[in-house]
A protein has these predicted regions:
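A contiguous pocket-lining binding segment that forms or flanks enzyme active sites
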Residues: 134-179
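Detector for small/aliphatic-rich hydrophobic stretches
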Residues: 1-82, 94, 100-109
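Short acidic, S/G/P-rich loop/turn micro-motifs used as interaction or catalytic elements
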Residues: 57-60, 88-90, 119, 144-149
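Hydrophobic/aromatic ligand-binding patch that stacks against planar heteroaromatic rings
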Residues: 74, 129, 160
Length: 212
């Protein structure tokens, strides 16, 4: 049986190996692919920052994950992505699917997937990954509004991101926005996906609101 300490030690070992590999981009912003939106944001979203992605309701959780993963892909052209996932997400929505991740544009070989039962463990793993200079993006998924995820915890993530150059994306489901150190905050819901030529379901589509 793997203990919390063993799991965290294994993650530290993985991160240490990554630090001997490719370095993330040093550009201060990453484009969202929409010139109008990039312009409104001053050139795109900032790297080395904490950004929050909220599902409009639990039913829109998979869309929030998909949008956050799309941001991670935009932010991280080549460096590893560390995805720290609370097990509640697997129970409610199923496990990440490698072929689907690849179809979205992320090579699964660049993905380090960490699962944790409790929000506290998600935060510990995300903070450890955010301190690793070889990581491009950390995607942390937390269910609900646990007490451990307070303003202080978000500040720790934000400071770690600023120091290392890592972009941190916190996906929240079944949670209301609260005080945090996030640079931006998004609310996501599913949108109708339709191929204009065939009328059949097409690429993933999201309805997104920038809250902050």
């Amino acid at each position: 049986m793997t203990t919390r300490r063993d799991a965290l030690a294994a993650l530290k070992g993985t991160l240490a190996r990554l630090e001997r590999g490719v370095m993330p981009s040093a550009l201060p912003h990453f484009s969202l692919g929409l010139p109008e939106l990039d312009g409104a944001l001053g050139g795109g979203l900032t790297r080395a920052s904490l950004h929050e992605v909220f599902a409009a309701s639990p039913a829109h959780g998979p869309s929030a994950t998909g949008f956050a993963l799309a941001l991670a892909i935009r932010a991280t052209p080549s460096a590893p992505v560390v995805w720290v996932r609370q097990r509640m997400f697997d129970q409610e929505f199923g496990r990440p699917y490698g072929h689907g991740i690849a179809a979205l544009g992320l090579d699964p070989g660049r993905l380090v997937l960490v699962r944790a039962r409790h929000a506290e463990d998600v935060l510990k793993a995300a903070l450890e990954a955010a301190r690793c200079t070889a990581v491009g993006t950390v995607l942390a998924e937390i269910w609900g509004s646990p007490k451990v995820l307070d303003l202080t915890a978000s500040r720790r993530l934000s400071l770690a991101a600023a120091a290392s150059g890592v972009t941190v994306l916190a996906t929240r489901v079944d949670a209301a926005p609260a005080a945090s150190a996030a640079t931006s905050r998004w609310q996501v819901r599913a949108a109708v996906s339709q191929d204009p030529q065939t009328g059949l379901p097409g690429l993933p589509a999201f309805s997104v609101t920038l809250l902050r």
